[in-house]
Amino acid sequence: MGRVFLTGEKANSVLKRYPRANGFFEEIRQGNIERECKEEFCTFEEAREAFENNEKTKEFWSTYTKAQQGESNRGSDWFQFYLTFPLIFGLFIILLVIFLIWRCFLRNKTRRQTVTEGHIPFPQHLNIITPPPPPDEVFDSSGLSPGFLGYVVGRSDSVSTRLSNCDPPPTYEEATGQVNLQRSETEPHLDPPPEYEDIVNSNSASAIPMVPVVTTIK
């Protein structure tokens, strides 16, 4: 019998029960066999020990096994998804990395070819299409074309000839008719100046006689 059964110390050294994370919650709310079997896997013997009745145990066991089969079927579907999704995602990441490496390698290769050929590629946003100048047009040292200079010179000559052909505007004296008066004032006087007696006599003759006013004081 000693070979079949172990003592308490040896049994505790082999079989140990560790407290669960929700041990404090189990102390507050005492569980039953149904909740424990739903949360964990239990056997028929554990259910019979809990119910202590074969009929109740069989009834519980039939419903419990059916529920376990349904959950296992749903879990198998999700298991396929969990297995294939990481594989597809990892394959997509690998292809993306390979594509980026290939693009970088191709860009460096084209850049090296352009440098060896002596052509420096310009950025695309700086490319400006400019029409080439006509072959017969030659620019002088000032940067202006002869056609433009001829146009400027011809225009200035036409303006100067137009201004030379025009008569100057009349003066103020000519416009107001005071030219003869000004000329007569500037010409030298031929007659001698009048005498003093003539000036006095002419002033006295032109004077108006004044009538004396007599005022009487009362």
UniProtKB/Swiss-Prot annotation:
Protein's name according to its UniProt entry: Transmembrane gamma-carboxyglutamic acid protein 1
Propeptide residue intervals: 1-20
Cytoplasmic compartment residues: 102-218
Membrane topology field: Single-pass type I membrane protein
PANTHER family referenced in this protein's UniProt entry, alphabetically: COAGULATION FACTOR, TRANSMEMBRANE GAMMA-CARBOXYGLUTAMIC ACID PROTEIN 1
First-listed, main subcellular location of the protein, grouped into a coarse class: membrane
Gene Ontology molecular function, alphabetical: calcium ion binding
UniProt keyword Disulfide bond, yes or no: yes
Domain of life: Eukaryota
Region Disordered, residue ranges: 161-195
Sorted UniProt keywords: Disulfide bond, Membrane, Transmembrane, Transmembrane helix
Domain Gla as annotated: residue spans: 20-66
Processing and modification events after translation: Gla residues are produced after subsequent post-translational modifications of glutamate by a vitamin K-dependent gamma-carboxylase.
Transmembrane segments: 81-101
Matching Pfam families: Gla
UniProt cross-references to InterPro entries, sorted A to Z: Coagulation_fac-like_Gla_dom, GLA-like_dom_SF, GLA_domain, Peptidase_S1_coag_factors
Compartment annotation: Membrane
